[in-house]
Amino acid sequence: MKIRIPDQKKAKNLEKIKWFFITAIFITSFFINNFFDKIGYFTRISIITLLVVFAISIALYTKKVKNVFVYINASKNEMKKITWPQYKETLYTTFIIISVTILISLLLWGLDSIIFRLIAFIISVRF
């Protein structure tokens, strides 16, 4: 079923109104916390919590949040399709990486020592 153009404009305007109310609610909760410090702490926190819950409940019906939930579900389905390596394969791969790292570091250390001694020899012969 295709949505007609006036319905699309109406839906777009409704989204804008929802986001305006969400923003207004969060700004109101900020002002309540900062400017009504004479009110008791528990009362202030209760009001702010109710406002935040109300803003979140409005946000759950916006198109962007619905798209986020669709993306999360698609990600979960993709995670199920992945073939994860077994513990033994992971352990062997880790040992190979550690061994190659140690081997390369020893080769570089040896090459550095040879170059250092060669340069020291050249400098000592020259002077």
UniProtKB/Swiss-Prot annotation:
Source organism of the structure: Buchnera aphidicola subsp. Schizaphis graminum (strain Sg)
Any Pfam family: SecE
Subunit structure: Component of the Sec protein translocase complex. Heterotrimer consisting of SecY, SecE and SecG subunits. The heterotrimers can form oligomers, although 1 heterotrimer is thought to be able to translocate proteins. Interacts with the ribosome. Interacts with SecDF, and other proteins may be involved. Interacts with SecA.
GO BP annotation list: intracellular protein transmembrane transport; protein secretion; protein targeting; protein transport by the Sec complex
HAMAP family according to UniProt: SecE
Keywords: Cell inner membrane, Cell membrane, Membrane, Protein transport, Translocation, Transmembrane, Transmembrane helix, Transport
Family annotation (InterPro entries): SecE_bac (IPR005807), SecE_sf (IPR038379), Translocase_SecE/Sec61-g (IPR001901)
Principal localisation: membrane
Coiled coil: none
Protein name in UniProt: Protein translocase subunit SecE
Location in or out of the cell: Cell inner membrane
Gene Ontology terms, MF aspect: protein transmembrane transporter activity
Membrane protein topology class: Multi-pass membrane protein
Functional description taken from the UniProt entry: Essential subunit of the Sec protein translocation channel SecYEG. Clamps together the 2 halves of SecY. May contact the channel plug during translocation.
Transmembrane region(s): 17-37, 39-59, 95-115
Gene Ontology cellular-component annotations: plasma membrane
